[in-house]
Amino acid sequence: MSDAMDVLLAGRIGLLVRIQSHPGARLALLDALNDYCENLDQEPGTEAFMIALDPSDEDVIWLYEWFTDQEALDAHRASDAFADLMHRMPELVAVPPGVLPINPLRVRLAKQPLEQSL
């Protein structure tokens, strides 16, 4: 049997978010998102928050998030850390973020990436 994390996610709520920074502001936007990520322990219903770079556009960042349920998503949006992030966003983003609601079904992660830390 594999040591991979393999979880069914039925009932979870997910978001795929596309954020386009002002030209040259991607590093500042990444700093803001990483600062936000450091506070996710204050949101117990936020189960995953992934930041990814768009390889074809140096001004675009993608977020993948999933939450235990609607109540957790509402708590996420009502958190102080989220309010701080939203306060920083206007000077960093070129257009309003695109948000695509999704329903996560399953995640499988190999053990090795989980053992590596920042």
Segments the model singles out, each with a brief description of its role:
Residues M1-G11, I51-D59, H87-L118:
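Glycine-rich beta-strand-turn "strand-cap" elements at beta-sheet edges
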Residues P23, S56-E58, T68-E71:
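Short, charged/polar surface micro-motifs in flexible loops or helix N-caps
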Residues R12-I19:
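Active-site-flanking beta-strand signature of metal-NTP-handling nucleotidyl enzymes
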Residues Q20-L29:
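Short, surface-exposed ligand-recognition loops at beta-strand->loop->(often short) alpha-helix junctions
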Residues C37-I61:
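Short, glycine- and small/hydrophobic-rich beta-strand elements in well-ordered beta-sheets
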Residues L8, N39-E47, W66-L100:
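An amphipathic, aromatic/His-enriched active-site/gating alpha helix that lines ligand/cofactor pockets
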Residues A28-E38:
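A contiguous binding-surface segment within folded domains or other stable secondary-structure elements
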